[in-house]
Amino acid sequence: DNSYKVSGGLHGVGVSVVNALSSKLHLIINRAGQVHEQEYHHGDPQYPLRVIGETDSSGTTVRFWPSELTFSQTIFNVEILARRLRELSFLNAGVRIVLRDERINLEHVYDYEGGLSEFVKYINEGKTHLNEIFHFTADTENGIGVEVALQWNESYQENVRCFTNNIPQKDGGTHLAGFRAALTRGLNQYLENENILKKEKVNVTGDDAREGLTAIISVKVPDPKFSSQTKEKLVSSEVKPAVEQAMNKEFSAYLLENPQAAKSIAGKIIDAARARDAARKAREMTRRKSALDIAGLPGKLADCQEKDPALSELYLVEGDSAGGSAKQGRNRKMQAILPLKGKILNVERARFDKMISSQEVGTLITALGCGIGREEYNPDKLRYHKII
């Protein structure tokens, strides 16, 4: 009964929808020492619920056949099922889930005693981590259960996943807001207490603190409220202070009790703050160079005469010698040539400040003219609609 207080939804509604979309639905319910059975065809019961035997076990078996009258395709994608069942096993430590694909005689068993700790470990597999996984569970006074696991790694991306009663919220919500507030407060307090901010002469932001962070936030909330029927954002106001209070207490204690981990995390944050500041300065410098100012690209870009981007082409060639040949053979009216030195930076794996400090990348950004960064990138300003 306690499980149903924080269930993800009304199970009867779910099975009713499945029934309406199935050519056949078969139910076996083991309850109170008896085995009950009922079957539906295209939503209509074939007989009343009946007792077909006795049992010592409890549980429900639901079998359904998707209706070909409703769906154009009724083939199950086992990867989608595996991803969700694995997720549920992580979220419910100790629950064993078995997925069998009898079409190809394949079986997956999901059983994670470590719960969210193993979830973080799974996500961070193959990455270099900076601290051991921090994991706690707490029950608050207003009946909200809070569970958090997190770990920093050497990547530059934030990966935080939020769940309410096992349902994922891709748009976050009040649980994410409480988590972020407590995380930032705890780290800022540590940096101030250790006098790190004054020593390093930097100002850090919440984004700096979350660079390279992998975290799972799972809350159990009686009667949760969401922004829409799809439950993609939690809006229950009582959840934010519950998560913030629990996280603040546990995380502050973790930083005090694990000085080496705290030092590694602080180093990561300082690096992120410096990189952000360097990127800001580089953006300002790039912004000052007009994309139409050919003086900004001395001896590099051989622009075309055409001013309409839809009719203009840009050819990226390797090296000045190839650039010279390309310039001689081009159609000056519509074809521009931009020579670049050899193998330029792999921007997918580079930090933003390193990417923007690369001369070749900077040349390319200026020539294309559409800007960089979330605030300034505008594809409508692209100077060439064909880039080769």
Swiss-Prot record:
* Reactions catalysed according to its record: ATP-dependent breakage, passage and rejoining of double-stranded DNA
In this UniProt entry, which cysteines form S-S bonds?
none
Its GO biological process terms?
DNA topological change
Q: Which SUPFAM superfamilies match?
A: ATPase domain of HSP90 chaperone/DNA topoisomerase II/histidine kinase (SSF55874), Ribosomal protein S5 domain 2-like (SSF54211), Type II DNA topoisomerase (SSF56719)
Against CDD domains, the record matches this protein to: TopoII_Trans_DNA_gyrase (cd00822)
* Gene Ontology terms for molecular function: ATP binding; DNA binding; DNA topoisomerase type II (double strand cut, ATP-hydrolyzing) activity
Q: Which residues form a coiled coil?
A: none
- Please name the source species: Acinetobacter pittii
**Note from the entry:** Few gyrases are as efficient as E.coli at forming negative supercoils. Not all organisms have 2 type II topoisomerases; in organisms with a single type II topoisomerase this enzyme also has to decatenate newly replicated chromosomes.
- What name goes with this protein? DNA gyrase subunit B
Q: Where in the cell is it found?
A: Cytoplasm
Q: How does it assemble?
A: Heterotetramer, composed of two GyrA and two GyrB chains. In the heterotetramer, GyrA contains the active site tyrosine that forms a transient covalent intermediate with DNA, while GyrB binds cofactors and catalyzes ATP hydrolysis.
Toprim domain: residues covered = 312-388
Q: Which domain of life is it from?
A: Bacteria
Q: What Gene3D superfamilies does this protein's entry cite?
A: 3.30.230.10, 3.40.50.670, Histidine kinase-like ATPase, C-terminal domain
Principal subcellular localization: cytoplasm
Q: What does this protein do?
A: A type II topoisomerase that negatively supercoils closed circular double-stranded (ds) DNA in an ATP-dependent manner to modulate DNA topology and maintain chromosomes in an underwound state. Negative supercoiling favors strand separation, and DNA replication, transcription, recombination and repair, all of which involve strand separation. Also able to catalyze the interconversion of other topological isomers of dsDNA rings, including catenanes and knotted rings. Type II topoisomerases break and join 2 DNA strands simultaneously in an ATP-dependent manner.
Q: Which UniProt keywords apply?
A: ATP-binding, Cytoplasm, DNA-binding, Isomerase, Nucleotide-binding, Topoisomerase
